[in-house]
Amino acid sequence: MSRQVWKGSTLLNPEPPVLVSCGSPDKPNLITVGWTGTICTQPPMLSISVRPERYSHHLIKESGEFVVNLPTESLVRAIDWCGVKSGRDVDKFAAMHLTAAPAAKVGTVLVEESPVNLECKVTQVIPLGSHDLFLAECVAVDVDEQLLDESGKLCLNKAKLIVYSHGDYLALGRKLGSFGYSVRKKKKVNQKIIGANSISASRLEGSRAVNARLRAAHVRPLQLC
């Protein structure tokens, strides 16, 4: 394989282009964030990177709260639009016909049209350069009940989530496996069935041979039960 060496860049792809809601309930705002990720399990934490000059930056920094709304195929136009327009000039919720619904644990709002909403409280802000990194604890998750199966398990494959890759919005493709499948042992019940089938086949062949010899000796053949 032939390779070229480029200078260091931000080519870690794909990533979820999330809609982040922030601001007060009477004047909420939306910002599209392409750089976000899970950073801790206990406590549950995630991060978002925002340029200091963005209108939403000071809203998040002052309130210490925001909501990450997962991106879906039906939201792709709003996601793109909210990423290029400023909340200083327009009401993004109204312009994109989105519903600002009350959050359960934070003082800002969530996007009702998004199937999963992660309510977050900022724990630390780290200036990095072009962007500030907001570290936050996820204090609540709002889930559309239509994504739950009969046992209450969350089925995100029903949500039609999208990703962002080097300037393009992409739908997710087919399932390739589940966590741990590469080391998972085969179920023993299958092995037992295979073994039982092999024994039955061997017995049948043996019985056929015996019956053939009995016929040759003019003796009535055996009957398998």
What kind of feature is each model-predicted range?
Residues 200, 204-208, 212, 217-224:
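Short, low-complexity intrinsically disordered segments enriched in A/P/G/S/L with frequent Arg
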